[in-house]
Regions:
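Short, Lys/Arg-enriched, disordered terminal segments
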Residues: 1-2, 218
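Active-site-proximal helix/loop segments of hydrolytic enzymes
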Residues: 2-4, 13-14, 22, 26-180
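Short, polar loop/linker segments at the starts of domains and inter-domain junctions
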Residues: 19, 152-153, 200-205
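Solvent-exposed beta-strand motifs enriched in subsets of small alpha/beta binding domains
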Residues: 178-218
Length: 218
């Protein structure tokens, strides 16, 4: 069974980058939780370094990952530079990253660019969580938090971004993405020519905790 470790950057007293009252830690958590939900829906075991607004040190993050064997480690972040001066997404792997991490990074980056982010490419870096984790690792910067256009894109397409990242991970795991069904199926529990009998059946169903209504047809 596929198993991944998701790391939502910053948290608690560590806000990460801040712009006009907007905190990176919150964006990272919100997006990451959505990705986790999509992966779990497809049967992937997901362990999260944090699932609420708490501080976790870099060492504790890597220690958490090293306790188990994961197919991949994915760290979520948002970038920052000078207000309104830079924009786009970029995805990082370790300076001597594995082929698997490179493949996943390319899939994630392609997905984000397809949703409208400027392509800043797949890059290498000596980031702690990439260096000190043992599984193939990537760190994704989902746009610049100090760029209004990137924030608008992040907010308006949050679900699509989460879905795109999840699809990239699933593709890397050779798991087919399945769309959620919007079809509703109604169950009939009988047809009666006498209204009193229909009302009795509705009463029985409601006593069992089943929502039921009478629909009259001719």
């Amino acid at each position: 069974m596929a198993r991944v470790c998701l790391d939502y950057g910053h948290g608690g007293v560590d806000s990460g980058a801040v712009y006009k009252g907007r905190c990176e830690k919150d964006d990272n958590l919100e997006l990451g939780l959505k990705v986790a939900g999509e992966l779990r829906r497809h049967g992937v075991v997901v362990d999260e370094v944090r699932d609420k607004d708490v501080f976790v040190s870099l060492k504790d993050r890597s220690d958490f990952e090293r306790k188990n064997d994961y197919d991949y480690f994915i760290s979520f972040h948002r970038n920052a530079f000078k207000p309104e001066k830079s924009k786009g997404s970029e995805t990082f792997i370790y300076i001597i990253g594995s082929e698997k991490s490179k493949e996943l990074a390319k899939r994630i980056q392609t997905s984000l660019v397809g949703l409208g982010f400027v392509d800043r490419g797949v890059k290498t870096a000596n980031f702690y969580v990439l260096r000190e984790t043992k599984s193939p690792a990537v760190l994704v910067e989902v746009g610049f938090i100090d760029n209004s256009e990137d924030n608008k894109l992040f907010d308006s397409k949050k679900d699509e971004i989460a879905k795109g990242i999840a699809k990239a991970i699933l593709e890397q795991l050779n798991i087919k993405y399945v769309e959620t069904s919007k079809v509703l199926y109604r169950v009939m529990a009988g047809s009666y020519t006498i209204k009193d009998n229909a009302e009795k059946q509705v009463k029985r169903l409601k006593e069992l905790g089943i929502d039921a209504v009478i629909i009259e047809s001719k």
